[in-house]
Amino acid sequence: LGVVSSKDVIKMNFNNKKQSADLNYPIDSLKYEVHSNPKNVVLIAIDSWNYRAFNQDITPHISHFADSCSRFTSHLSSSNGTRGSIFGLFFSLSSIYWTDFEVSGIQPLLIEELLKQNYQIGIYPSATIVNPPFAKILFSKVPDLRTHTEGKTVYDRDCRITADYLQALDTLGSGTKPFFSFLFYDLAHGYEVPKDKLYRFQPSWEFADYMKLNNDIDPTPFLNLYYNCVAEADS
C-alpha cells in the first residue's frame, strides 16, 4: 500500500520476545578455529533442480566439477519446495520452524558468524527474495542487500547474475576481506528458455502448459523442457 517501504519491511523486527525465548537456536554455541587466512565461500543453488537431472548428459560442467570434489550423498533436504529447502539449507532445521523464525528476527547462525568475522556478503538472486521473504528471514542484517535482478525473462535474469558476479569477482578477489557469495538460479524453476536453447533434448515443449498434463499424456516433451532448462543453467 506504500505505507512501509520494502527495505523497511526486510529490516523490521516484530520484537516477539516470547517467540524468541521459545526458540533455542542454536542449542549449542558454534565452535570453530579462526584462521589468519580465512577461506572465501561461494554457494550456488539451482531452484527446483531434481537429482535425476544431475548427470553427464544434462549437467556436464557440474558433473565434471563434482568429480574432483567432496559429495555429500546422505544429506536430506528439509523440503521439496523452494521456501522450505532454502530455509533448511541456511538454518539446518526443518521448515516447520519457518513462521517462528520469521517473527523472531533470529538470523541463521551461518550469516551471523560470517558478519562477525567481517566477511563481505553478496547475494545474487535471479528471482526476487522479497517473496518468499528470504531477505527478511535469512539476510536482514546483510548490508546493501540485493533483493532482485533486472530482466524481462528468467533466462535474462539468470544470465545477469552470472555476469554481475563475474564482474564483482574482480573486486572481491583483490580485497583484504574474505567474502561469502550466494547465487540463486531460477531457470529450472521457471521452465522457460529461449527457443534456440531447446535443442539439447527433443521433443520438447516450448513452455510448461500445465493444462495439458494428465495421467495419460506422454511426459517426455514436458520432461525434456525441464532438462533443457537445467542444461542451460549448467552452461
Each model region followed by its residue ranges:
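Metal-dependent active-site segment of extracytoplasmic phospho-/sulfohydrolases and closely related
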Residues: 42-43, 225-235
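Short glycine/proline- and acidic residue-enriched helix-loop micro-motifs
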Residues: 215-227
